[in-house]
Amino acid sequence: MTEKKSPVISFKDFSFQYRAQKKPTLTGINLDIYPGEKVLIAGPSGSGKSTLAGCVNGLNPFSNPGECKGTLTVDGVDAPHSSIFELSAHVGTVLQDPDGQFIGLTVGEDIAFALENSCTPQDEMHEITRHAAELVGIENHLDYAPHELSGGQKQRVSLAGVMVDQVKILLFDEPLANLDPAAGKQAIELIDEIQKKTDTTVLIIEHRLEDVLWRNVDRIVLVNEGKILADMTPDELLSTSLLADNGIREPLYVTAMRYAGIDITKEKKPAHVDSVVLDDIDRKKLQDWFEAQPIQEDAGEREKLLEVRNLSFGYTKDHQTLRNVSLSIDK
């Protein structure tokens, strides 16, 4: 008989109220997250999802004063009666604004910041810093300053900086907020790769559901008005109307299936476009719906407002950020 794992994060009848507010932001939270899981916590703006994350890493109530009720244990620690310092040894947090997390003058200094604070010997510090940088693919940028990095690269540095402590839990607070779709996919791929290599527990706080589902997650926890409305697998949640009912845009291919009149069930595996199971009747419905859509006629040649031809640019002579970019934008 397989022994059941104990949760690494456990909320029991938990609520949190900021000192400056009259009502609790979180109420009646019951949630268990197990070692090695990757869990997406989704919800519209103001739903309480970031407050929930702040309770896990200790920002609430130690940096943002407030009152906790119920119990919350994080890797065996009684979180509300602990400290940010103690919880930081268990939870590594990557903020939505990497600039607010950048401390060092260079990438290498920033990654090594926690090691310096713990008086790690120089030789060991260099080795750990190099290993963390290689893990996130930033090892060739250790001498770069913050302003020389893209948003995605800064996020990699932040991730490397929290990984030097070998934490068991990685928390990403809206990691896609400042990234374009392409960089967002790269960020999700990186999170997935790191989780597989290190077997850490990963929490992703995000409302851009389709982008997060670019790689698999074990569960989606839907939060709104400070309460947990759903705790399901992606396939289960996408076969309901809960996302749309609570202001979260479901993946566009799922919306297209609904418009075509397809009955979406968890058996159809709607969590990823490449895994969707459609029978012949479903395919016919989708094709008929697609062919019924009006085709926009070409308006002919338009006045060009912006035109770029073969543009290259680099912050340094040795590294080009843009290479032979050509584009035009019409009026």
Predicted segments, located by residue:
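Conserved ABC ATPase "signature" C-loop
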Residues: E225-G226
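Conserved ABC transporter NBD signature motif
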Residues: P65-V77
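Catalytic Walker B motif of ABC-type/P-loop ATPase nucleotide-binding domains
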Residues: L170-E174
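ABC ATPase C-loop
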Residues: V162-M163
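Conserved ABC ATPase signature
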Residues: A145-L149, Q153
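Conserved ABC ATPase "signature" region
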Residues: D123-H141, L306
